[in-house]
Structures are given as C-alpha cells and as structure tokens.
C-alpha cells in the first residue's frame, strides 16, 4: 500500500487507539480479550453452566449474541418505538444447552438487556468496551463466511457467483466500526454501495433534505473505504468517479460491478484477524492467563498458541462428521474462508477439504431441531504450523499490480504460485462497454491481461514451527501447481439468507 504510513494498524482500529507502539498495541488488544474472557466467566456463573457446558461453542454463540443485542442501540430504539407482539424490547436471550441425565437439553433463557450491559461493563472496568463487541462481531462474521456461500446475495445485485471470494465480512453489522471495515472484502463494499444506489433510484427523496445529506456522507465514506482497498491508480480513480457522481445511478452500478470483477485479478487489500469464540478466552482467563500483561495480537502466533491448548466442544447432529465440524470452526477461527486450501492444509497439518464435501451443517442449532438424538464432540482446532495473517491480497507486484489469486483472498502471508485460468475471468470483461470513461477501464483491463499466472505470491514467505515465536526460521512450502484450492467452487454450500 502506497499510503501505508497514514494507515492505522488493525490493532489500533481494534482498540480505537491513537498511535501506539507495538507493545502498547499488544497490551490494549490483550485488555480487550481479558474483558471478553471475564464477561464469559461471569455469564457461565449466572447461567450455572458446568465447565463442559461453558466450553460448548453453541452456548458461547448465544452468550455473545446476547451482549451484542444488548448494546445494539439502533435496534433497541427501533424495537421500543415499534413494539411487536410477544417480544420484549428490554430483554434478550437465546438457547442454552445443558447436559441432563446423559442427554442434551435446550433451555431458553431471557435476561434484561440492562443486566447484560452491567455484567459486560463490570468485566471491562466500567467501559462500554466497543472493541470487544466488534471483535465478537468479526468472529460471527468469519463463521458465517466459512459456513455459507453468498451466491444469492451476489446474483440479486447483478454480480457473478464466481465473485464469492470477494465477500468477506458480508454479514457484519453496519455498526462494526473501523475494525469491521478493515475486514470487509471488495465485493461486500460493492454490494453495500449498490444497495444504497438502488434505493436512490427507487425513492426520489432518498438523497434530499437533512436525511439525504447524512445518506450522502455515508455513501462517500463507503466509497472511500472501498477506494482504500484498491491498490492500483486506475481502480482508485474509478472509485473517485463513483464517489463524486452528483446523482448515483445505473452507470455507477455498472462501474462498481466492473471494479468488483477486476478485483478477482487485481486483488484489494482486506485484513484478516483471528477472532476466537468467547468460550476460548473465558477458560484461559479463568486459568490465570493475563492477556493484557502478556500482550496479544490477532495477526501473529498468539491465536494459534491459544487454540493449541483450548478445549472447545460442539453439539453434533446424528449424520454430521465431527472432523468436518472441526474444520469449519478451525477455518472460522483463522479467518481462512477464502484462503487457498493448499495453504490451509499445510498450516493445519491435515487436509482441508472444500465446503461441498463437508458433511456438516452450520454450528448453530435451530429451535425446532430434535435434541434427543444430539451428541457432542471435541473440536480439533490445533495446527501444525503458524503463519502471519496478511492484508495484501497477494498481488505479486504492488507498484503495477499483478496477478493476485483468482477465487482466493489470501489469509496467510505464505509463498504460493498462482494457478488460475485467466481466460475465464477475462471473458467476463468482453463486450461490456456501458459505464463511462473507458480509458480507466482500458487501463484496468490492460493490467489484468498482463498479469502473469506463473508468478509467485508472497515470495520467500513461509510458515513457522509453533516453537518459533519470533518467526525466525520460515519454512517455505512447495505446492502442487495443478489445482488451486478454492473452498467454495464445485460446491453446494448452504445460503446465508435462507
């Protein structure tokens, strides 16, 4: 990134920090993790959960969701003003699973949001600790990215299902702040912008008046976030054009879809963070580990080390494969939904297989599912090596943007070759001359055509032994060139929307 100096690191975004040095950043991220852990311990006490029940990922998700809902100001206000039958706007809750007489039972719990907020603040030294809330949102988002393929959402906005590798963070709430914006993929931003433009086309008052002014500010801010993800001058110039449009309409939508397609080769920079479920942080804090004192990073060895020693359990449906459930959660914990499967497999030390071959549904259990036949098992979340998370998009040459990996948004900074069939991608660009100034388009298409698939991304970068905390001895893996390991292709993952 050319403007690297002006960018805040993820950890600064994560902790709303001003400029901090590495030690301060590690401490403030650690403080955030401490808070989540303390909150989780307190909630397990409130709910009278056994140690095993407290380590159940489904219980963790319910507890995380309760606190996120308790702090969702906008929705809380909406619920107060639009009361719906049988829903108390002041309460939040969800399913909690307990082991009774050798069987799993579902118990629906309900708490005052005020009470949950009190427990959360108490665990966070009286602060609202927004960073911790965002952290949990990103964990939920990473889990969704791994579980569901967003083809329907893509098709609805006129994009191509092959662009699913651009959809990281597509289920993050709007209120997820700078840390949330950093992990959103190019496709996610394009989708949000298209939705806004479409509303403007259908509603003539959308851009007018006081509300319209706020909308306009939001629109321009989203354009700037997306612009910041692109790494070539031509893509950025096109974003300026979209942002400055007096009356955004179909021409802008065309431009955005064109830009999204171009991002399949000229990859955007999208951050990756390892956000773990609260039931990992809780037991670690309970066992006496002081995250703030020791320091913690979301993009280094720390999450790997934490997962090496964590016991996490999951409910398993009768026909699900526990190993496959483990893979799903492992990928979510490492933010690896769009990583090359060859790279993930090497790091994990066991073969990581495509979504369509996994015999497992999502982690959450629907309220109408039968608990009688429900089992549980340990999730295997350990790894053989660790690697540094990247945000570069894997373009081999930052100055003149070259081939990033198609259908992949790299998570780990690990050398790999770029096996891809550029012709398929380029075919998407022929005969599409709508939209305006074609000089920028011509420039972008020229860059894409000159991208060479035989180049190597992240040259010389490797994985590290778990004993190598200082990342001193990189092990550069060699991969089988022939097939690129895309998680979602040739595949029938469930839809997030259904």
Curated annotation (Swiss-Prot):
Subcellular localization: Virion; Host nucleus
Keyword entries, A-Z: Capsid protein, Helical capsid protein, Host nucleus, Host-virus interaction, Ribonucleoprotein, RNA-binding, Viral nucleoprotein, Viral penetration into host nucleus, Virion, Virus entry into host cell
Region ranges (Disordered): 1-21
Residue window of motif Bipartite nuclear localization signal: 198-216
Sample GO molecular function, one term: structural molecule activity
One Gene Ontology CC term in the entry: host cell
Post-translational modification remark: Late in virus-infected cells, may be cleaved from a 56-kDa protein to a 53-kDa protein by a cellular caspase. This cleavage might be a marker for the onset of apoptosis in infected cells or have a specific function in virus host interaction.
A single BP term in Gene Ontology: symbiont entry into host cell
Record InterPro entries: Flu_NP (IPR002141)
Motif Unconventional nuclear localization signal location, chain numbering: 1-18
Coiled coil: none
Biased composition (Basic and acidic residues): 8-21
Superkingdom in the source lineage: Viruses
Subunit record text: Homomultimerizes to form the nucleocapsid. May bind host exportin-1/XPO1. Binds to viral genomic RNA. Protein-RNA contacts are mediated by a combination of electrostatic interactions between positively charged residues and the phosphate backbone and planar interactions between aromatic side chains and bases.
HAMAP family (alphabetical): INFV_NCAP
Family label: Belongs to the influenza viruses nucleoprotein family.
Function: Encapsidates the negative strand viral RNA, protecting it from nucleases. The encapsidated genomic RNA is termed the ribonucleoprotein (RNP) and serves as template for transcription and replication. The RNP needs to be localized in the host nucleus to start an infectious cycle, but is too large to diffuse through the nuclear pore complex. NP comprises at least 2 nuclear localization signals that are responsible for the active RNP import into the nucleus through cellular importin alpha/beta pathway.
Official protein name in the record: Nucleoprotein
Organism field: Influenza A virus (strain A/Brazil/11/1978 H1N1)
